[in-house]
């Protein structure tokens, strides 16, 4: 018989750096998940891309066991990395903080493709360009 799902937990954790401190500990503790076991498994799975923010969806079952799926880093984080910035603009319509090339946008779109609801890479590029625009990053042709 299949296990009964009692909940989902969505978190964004730096890859390879999960620890029982907030926000991970309290979120998992509420559902009764073994926090250290999750941290060990997550860190082992994500150690290759250490430091990048990694979204994770944790499925918690009635017997307090869990499974998790890691997703690709948010487009905003990838754009900041490509543009070599610390953060986006506070006023993106007035202050532009950096630039990225169309080729960099294409690379990000191809990387994000499994997690986006775009039909093709061109649609994914448009989504990434919209994120860049909202962060005050200019996309050059």
Curated annotation (Swiss-Prot):
Modification comment: One or more lysine residues are methylated.
* Disulfide cysteine pairs (residue numbers): none
Q: Does the keyword RNA-binding apply?
A: yes
Spell out the Gene3D superfamilies in the cross-references.
Answer: Ribosomal protein L11, C-terminal domain (1.10.10.250), Ribosomal protein L11/L12, N-terminal domain (3.30.1550.10)
GO-annotated biological processes: translation
Q: Any coiled-coil ranges, and where?
A: none
User: By its UniProt entry, which SMART domains does this protein fall under?
Assistant: RL11 (SM00649)
* GO CC annotation, single: cytosolic large ribosomal subunit
* InterPro entries named among the record's database cross-references: Ribosomal_uL11 (IPR000911), Ribosomal_uL11_bac-typ (IPR006519), Ribosomal_uL11_C (IPR020783), Ribosomal_uL11_C_sf (IPR036769), Ribosomal_uL11_N (IPR020784), Ribosomal_uL11_N_sf (IPR036796)
Recorded hits in CDD domains, A to Z, give: Ribosomal_L11
Keyword set includes NAD: no
> Keywords of this protein's UniProt record, alphabetized?
Methylation, Ribonucleoprotein, Ribosomal protein, RNA-binding, rRNA-binding
Q: Which terms in the Gene Ontology molecular function aspect does this entry carry?
A: large ribosomal subunit rRNA binding; structural constituent of ribosome
Q: Describe its partners and assembly state.
A: Part of the ribosomal stalk of the 50S ribosomal subunit. Interacts with L10 and the large rRNA to form the base of the stalk. L10 forms an elongated spine to which L12 dimers bind in a sequential fashion forming a multimeric L10(L12)X complex.
Its biological function?
Forms part of the ribosomal stalk which helps the ribosome interact with GTP-bound translation factors.
Indicate what this protein is called per its UniProt record. Answer: Large ribosomal subunit protein uL11
Species source reads Chlorobium phaeobacteroides (strain DSM 266 / SMG 266 / 2430)
């Amino acid at each position: 018989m299949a296990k009964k799902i009692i909940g989902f937990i969505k978190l964004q954790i730096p890859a390879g750096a999960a620890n029982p401190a907030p926000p991970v500990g309290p979120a998992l503790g509420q559902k009764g998940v073994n926090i250290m076991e999750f941290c060990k498994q997550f860190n082992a799975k994500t150690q290759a891309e250490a430091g990048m923010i990694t979204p994770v969806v944790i499925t918690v079952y009635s017997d307090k066991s869990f499974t998790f799926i890691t997703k690709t880093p948010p487009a905003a984080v990838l754009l900041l990395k490509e543009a070599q910035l610390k953060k986006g603009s506070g006023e993106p319509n007035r202050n532009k903080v950096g630039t990225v090339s169309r080729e960099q946008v294409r690379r990000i779109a191809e990387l994000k493709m499994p997690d986006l609801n775009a039909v093709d890479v061109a649609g994914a590029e448009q989504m990434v360009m919209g994120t860049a625009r909202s962060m005050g990053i200019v996309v050059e042709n």
